[in-house]
């Protein structure tokens, strides 16, 4: 009986010893760790990327170059930058500027500060003005809204005998003219940051214009 107990104890010790893994020395970097053998010990083979389930989120955007992806390889609602798009340039125009400007510096068309003081203070207003803000004597925006422009009365189209399938053309005041519209009523659920592509008739389509190329300009 004692021999049987000793034999079982030794067997358990051997099994336990075999379960311990030797420390491997692999001269390789595995981003997702190492593969394991049947004993659960690491071996010198890289594990594959773990599968991640991406959400079936729908983006109401048109991206000519496709969508960006996150760290898990899932698409996100951001467009890839075009290969033709010029890289953004760093602003370095204030290196030699010794001026102190209370209201900050004037910025150029590229958004870079110039060595020139701004006349206007930083504009802060919690009022939304649908027709724009009034400006002061220096041309700076104020927190007063412009009045709505007076609506011009439109002439009656009783004398117009035309039937227009797509409706009538409207002038700059929004008044109908006795002229047929070539374009159908435009309906599109895609927002185009740089406007919509137009067809051969000059009518808007539900395709977005590409981002315009920027010139490679240095800010000075």
Curated annotation (Swiss-Prot):
Signal sequence span is 1-19
Return the GO cellular component terms, semicolon-separated. Answer: extracellular region; plasma membrane
Any one GO MF term held by the record is: serine-type endopeptidase inhibitor activity
**What tissue specificity does the UniProt entry give?**
Gland cells. It is more strongly expressed in the head than in the gastric tissue.
Instruction: Give residue ranges for domain Antistasin-like.
Output: 21-46, 54-79, 91-117, 120-145, 154-180, 183-208
Q: Any S-S bridges, and between which cysteines?
A: none
Q: Which residues cross the membrane?
A: none
Q: Where in the cell is it found?
A: Secreted
Q: Name the Gene3D superfamilies on file.
A: Antistasin, domain 1 (2.10.22.10)
Entry keywords, A to Z: Heparin-binding, Protease inhibitor, Repeat, Secreted, Serine protease inhibitor, Signal
Site Reactive bond: give positions: 27-28, 60-61, 98-99, 161-162
Matching entries from InterPro entries are given as:
Antistasin-like, CRIM1, Hirudin/antistatin
Q: Is the keyword Membrane assigned to this protein?
A: no
What is the protein's known function?
This highly disulfide-bonded protein is a potent inhibitor of factor Xa. Facilitates digestion of tissues and may also protect the gastric tissues from its own digestive enzymes. May have therapeutic utility as an anticoagulant. Also exhibits a strong metastatic activity.
What does the sequence similarity comment in the record state about its family? Belongs to the protease inhibitor I15 (antistasin) family.
* Protein known as: Antistasin
Query: Could you tell me which species this protein originates from?
Result: Hydra vulgaris (Hydra)
